[in-house]
Amino acid sequence: MAWIQLRIHTHRDNADLLGDLLMDQGSLSITYEDGQDEPIFEPKLGETPLWQDTVMIALFDAGTDLAPTIEFLESMPFLGKGFNHKIEQVEDKDWIREWMDSFHPIQFGSRLWICPSWREIPDPTAVNVILDPGLAFGTGTHPTTALCLEWLDSLDLSNQEVIDFGCGSGILAIAAIKLGAKKVTGVDIDYQAIDASKANAERNDVVDKLALYLPEDQPANLQADVLVANILAGPLKELAPLIAEKVKIGGKLALSGLLQEQAQEVSDFYSQWFIMDPVSNKEDWSRLTGIRK
């Protein structure tokens, strides 16, 4: 089945109303895009911010006559006659197959590979983590996850205890186990992340070495030789004393989820507890590492 999509440029203040109007006109779905390459940083809890110049994309059945819809929208004062829009035909595809074809095994460092379950493992002798994209958790494609995976690959984790602080999919925790860690503890505020981490650990046959906790359930005095936290700059600063006390003296720390312009400030803050290394960057993102004093 083919589709028609109507693309409309609008101000974010009008997005909710326009979305309702489009649904009333028979749109099957509404999606949003950035109209002017405007970054959005760290939304507050419960917020779903939009770009100032937002492109709204309304999907309709291929047989829909959009002329009445355009005429109706032109009567809206916030749009007006000749408003900025475009009508496009969308080719019918096997979208699930298209989506699956877009994911390939990725190598991180010298030993580690992250592989979707439907792909052939490139190097059976390497350290392979089987992980499928799903939910809103890391699969290695984002620069911050890649920075953390590369760092873990560079370490000798033999007989080390590791904490994955903000474990998400469990990708970092599972990689640490596969790279030799004797025990890994994953902590996350989202019970869905705990469930995702457990499912991925079971798929990789490492569930016996992984303990998973919500913050309120984690053991008292939890400490490790290595801690990795791929979250955001705000929580990293707010939780710095807690994170620091979880790393043994002489232990190793990696922090990511930071934009390059945020990295130095966070590094300076953590220098109270850690001997910090130079910042490592990938695209617009940074990773901080250090040794516990």
Curated annotation (Swiss-Prot):
Stretch forming the signal peptide: none
Reactions performed catalytically: L-lysyl-[protein] + 3 S-adenosyl-L-methionine = N(6),N(6),N(6)-trimethyl-L-lysyl-[protein] + 3 S-adenosyl-L-homocysteine + 3 H(+)
Binding site for S-adenosyl-L-methionine: T145, G166, D188, N230
Superkingdom per UniProt: Bacteria
Keywords: Cytoplasm, Methyltransferase, S-adenosyl-L-methionine, Transferase
GO biological process: methylation
Pfam families membership: PrmA
Coiled coil start-end: none
Cystine bridges: none
InterPro entries: Ribosomal_L11_MeTrfase_PrmA, Ribosomal_PrmA_MeTrfase, SAM-dependent_MTases_sf
Annotated family: Belongs to the methyltransferase superfamily. PrmA family.
Function: Methylates ribosomal protein L11.
Name of the protein: Ribosomal protein L11 methyltransferase
